Amino acid sequence: MPTIKQLIRNARQPIRNVTKSPALRGCPQRRGTCTRVYTITPKKPNSALRKVARVRLTSGFEITAYIPGIGHNLQEHSVVLVRGGRVKDLPGVRYHIVRGTLDAVGVKDRQQGRSKYGVKKPK
C-alpha cells in the first residue's frame, strides 16, 4: 500500500481498456474493399474450410474478416461492411462481414435467424 505522500507525488494510473477490434477505430462498422477471398482451416478439434476475406478498410487497416452463412458472392474488389466479432476457431480472424449490405448479398433460402444474414421476410 502506498503512503499518502507517495500518492501525492505519483497519482494512480487509470486502467486503460484495450479494444478487441482496433481496426474499427471505435466505430460500430467500417467499409472496406476485399483484396483476397479464400478459405482457411480451423484450430485443432474442428475441421472445415471456413470462408474468409482479406479486407482493406477505410481506416487504412488490412484485416481478415469472416464471411458468415452458406454460400457468398464476394470476390476481389467487392465493397463490404465489416463489424467486430471474432471467430473462436480461426486464429487472427477478429471481424465479421455484414451480409445483405453493399456488395455482400444475403444468404439464399434462409428461413430462421434471417436478420443476422441480411435476408428479407419471405412472402
Swiss-Prot record:
Coiled coil: none annotated. Keywords: Chloroplast, Plastid, Ribonucleoprotein, Ribosomal protein, RNA-binding, rRNA-binding. GO terms for cellular component: chloroplast; small ribosomal subunit. It is found in: Plastid, Chloroplast. It comes from the Eukaryota. One of its GO terms (biological process) is translation. The keyword RNA-binding applies. PROSITE patterns: RIBOSOMAL_S12. The keyword Ribonucleoprotein applies. Its main location: plastid. GO terms for molecular function: rRNA binding; structural constituent of ribosome. It holds the Pfam family Ribosom_S12_S23. InterPro entries: NA-bd_OB-fold, Ribosomal_uS12, Ribosomal_uS12_bac. NCBIfam families: rpsL_bact. Belongs to the universal ribosomal protein uS12 family. Part of the 30S ribosomal subunit. With S4 and S5 plays an important role in translational accuracy. Located at the interface of the 30S and 50S subunits. PANTHER family: 30S RIBOSOMAL PROTEIN S12 FAMILY MEMBER. HAMAP family: Ribosomal_uS12_B (MF_00403_B). This is Small ribosomal subunit protein uS12cz/uS12cy. The lineage of its organism: Eukaryota, Viridiplantae, Streptophyta, Embryophyta, Tracheophyta.
